[in-house]
Amino acid sequence: MPDRIEEFLEAGLIAHIAYVENGEPRTIPFFYHYEAGHIYVHGSAGAGTLRILEDGRQVAVSVALLDDLVASKTASHHTANYRSVVVFGRCHRISNLAKKRRILDATTERYFPGRHTPQDYAPATDDDLTRMELVAIEIEEAQAKARSGGPMGPNDDEENAPGTAFVAPA
């Protein structure tokens, strides 16, 4: 996996998972954990959300990070600085409790750095993990796209041109 793709996946916060159900396109946002060519998502075994991600289902996953808003002196040249990844892969259910525990702990550390069991929260019990679905999406193909830099409109460098051009952190 190219470093840039891994960097973007490790930095992202929300993954939008797209799939086709009964001939209709669908997408669902998830917190996720990326590790070694796999995107992991978890949720309640009783909820229907993860049931649709059955073993072998093909999915597309999109992760995007907005870094800056880029204003131009020309309306059609307003843009953004961003990093994004689209991956294609297949879903696999994880039933091993030790792996579920490890991925759940890694996901918690990713979104809540510095929180640890037992001082900050109770660890997941085997019963908790049994009631939790964990799906691994094995990445088969991935593409990254990014933009960085300042305004690039036709008059953005001209001091006397009307309007303002700037970069605002998101």
Where are these regions (language model features)?
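C-terminal edge-of-domain segments
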Residues: S95-A170
